[in-house]
Amino acid sequence: MAKAAKTIKVEQTGSAIRRHHSQRSTLVGLKLNKIGRTSELQDTPEIRGMIAKVRHIVRVIDET
């Protein structure tokens, strides 16, 4: 029986305006582009690192 992949749900709470281009690219990598948008992603160390990089403009909603 295969394990279900863990997921993490994030929401963009801040604007990407006047942010460094690497932070904007990170938001695109997280599938976010506007305030209030949510994205459900696999819970991997890479995704966790991306969230940590833009933690001031995103919020973790749910971890399953």
Curated annotation (Swiss-Prot):
Region (Disordered): 1-22
Keyword Hydrolase recorded: no
GO CC, alphabetical: large ribosomal subunit
InterPro entries noted in UniProt: Ribo_uL30_ferredoxin-like_sf (IPR036919), Ribosomal_uL30_bac-type (IPR005996), Ribosomal_uL30_ferredoxin-like (IPR016082)
UniProt xrefs under SUPFAM superfamilies: Ribosomal protein L30p/L7e
GO-annotated biological processes: translation
Gene Ontology terms, MF aspect: structural constituent of ribosome
Pfam families assigned to the protein according to its UniProt record, in alphabetical order: Ribosomal_L30 (PF00327)
Superkingdom of origin organism: Bacteria
The keyword Iron-sulfur belongs to this UniProt entry's keyword annotation: no
Keywords: Ribonucleoprotein, Ribosomal protein
Quaternary structure annotation from Swiss-Prot or TrEMBL: Part of the 50S ribosomal subunit.
Cited HAMAP family: Ribosomal_uL30_B
Family label: Belongs to the universal ribosomal protein uL30 family.
Protein name per UniProt: Large ribosomal subunit protein uL30
Recorded name of the encoding gene: rpmD
